Amino acid sequence: MEPYVLLDPRQKALYRDVMQESYETLMSIAQGLVNHKAAEEDAVGLKEDAVGSEEPQTHPPHNPAQNRTAGSHRRKAKRPDKAAPLGVAQTPPAAPTPKRDGVKPSRVRDRPFGCPDCGKSFPWASHLERHRRVHTGERPYSCPECGESYSQSSHLVQHRRTHGGDRPHKCQHCGKPFAGAAQLLAHSRGHAADRPHRCGDCGKGFVWASHLERHRRVHTGEKPYECPECGEAFSQGSHLTKHRRSHARSGRTAAPLRKCFGQSSDLVQHRSRAGKKPQRCAECGKAFRAAPPLRRHRRERSHRCGDCGKGFAWASHLQRHRRVHTGERPFPCGLCGERFSQKAHLLQHGKTHRPERPYKCGDCGKRFENAPPFLAHRRGHAALKSFTCGDCGKGFAWASHLQRHRRVHTGEKPYECPECGEAFSQGSHLTKHRRSHGPKAPLLPVQGRGEAGEPLRASPLSSGAEQRDGRRAQRGGVEEEVGWGANRAVLRGRSAHSWPRSHLPMLGC
């Protein structure tokens, strides 16, 4: 049942049709064997009657009612069956099965309507017509709202529930409604407490072994999916598929992706849609192969914030964003009373009240619920802190962190709000402050003047390689690589200590 649950509604309906046809075929073959055996027994009985008629003295008199019944059976046997339609497979008529010992014959219809493509036969012409759509790819039932078409009316009825909000199947755990029972069953497995496949590194549980195998690559770093064009490797096949689209967009020729299908109807549908983009946006002219991507495109950024102009695809996202401007925090913590603007933040905060924190730091005693933040915290203790503050002796692993810390002692605040003039020591503080003013102002370049009067400017990085390779700093007379952010912080620090205040940059967020 597990592979059946993973199918989409259209594939499930096709699977049910094929299984029903197979069942009817087996029943028809079995009934044919029964009818053939009954016909042989009738032939033997007629011969015995003929032999008995030669000796009238010893044979008992016949019942007229039985004679009429037997005659009617013989007349029915001599009557030819109705002719099957032209071009349809003909099956020989089955011999009549008379009542024997009070047992009624089984009513199994003949299957005169055969498919010329695969040879399957059906008792009704309508069944054959519906089956033929598997080979032709015909989809006569179209949705009037989104234009998606289906081969059977039942599939269209199932699809239209998604538009009308008719979702009768509701999850008992979270209350989420679903249009079909199969979707509810697949969703309910996510709530199942039985997660037998557990990761040995972080303890996370999974319902399926394949999900655990995919998760294990996070710890092992395995990347089995390699791009044939540039050699870049990925841990998941879907990531490789998305990456290869970038080659097609940039003009580089990529090897064609071979797509496989489990049903011939899916292949027919794929061939009919390949290379065609009949759905076109009336506003920008962008074309799409199907209606659902066009609907998603129309929804993109349709809900805009009146304060900052930022667009959102959903009204709920806009409502959540509006709390940044209004300061609303409707989600309070029931234990400590702290309030949050988003429910996800409240759930994250609630974990701090739980005692289940198995990962404990041996240096500072801090506890963590999950392994990734614990490992990141441990790296902070293990890192070489060679950048030491001359005032308080505190060490830092990066020069940028030291430069930021130095502002605590110097009182330097290089980030100034262009609207009200308030200054801040960190750019993140300026970002939070500017939200209170409404729309964001454009970013201004980081610049100043050096000792010789030449302008200094933080040059933009052109690639990640330059970001990694072009970073140098002086550490104890030896050149060593540090983050580009450290270089920028050094420049910013020199400008703060050596240059007048009027030359300090006005930074935006």
Curated annotation (Swiss-Prot):
Establish whether keyword Repeat is in the entry.
yes
Classification via SUPFAM superfamilies: beta-beta-alpha zinc fingers, KRAB domain (Kruppel-associated box)
Q: Name one Pfam family in it.
A: KRAB
Q: Which GO terms describe its biological process?
A: regulation of transcription by RNA polymerase II
Q: Which family does it belong to?
A: Belongs to the krueppel C2H2-type zinc-finger protein family.
Query: Which parts of this chain are annotated as the region Disordered?
Result: 41-114, 428-479
The keyword Phosphoprotein belongs to this UniProt entry's keyword annotation: no
Q: What Gene3D superfamilies does the database record attribute to this sequence?
A: 6.10.140.140, Classic Zinc Finger
Q: Which GO terms describe its molecular function?
A: DNA-binding transcription factor activity, RNA polymerase II-specific; RNA polymerase II transcription regulatory region sequence-specific DNA binding; zinc ion binding
Q: Which organism is it from?
A: Gallus gallus (Chicken)
Record's compositionally biased regions (Basic and acidic residues): 41-50, 98-112
Keywords for this protein: DNA-binding, Metal-binding, Nucleus, Repeat, Zinc, Zinc-finger
Domain (KRAB) spans 1-61
Zinc-finger (C2H2-type) residue ranges come to: 113-135, 141-163, 169-191, 197-219, 225-247, 279-303, 303-325, 331-353, 359-383, 387-409, 415-437
Location(s) in or outside the cell? Nucleus
Under which name does UniProt file this protein?
A: Zinc finger protein CKR1
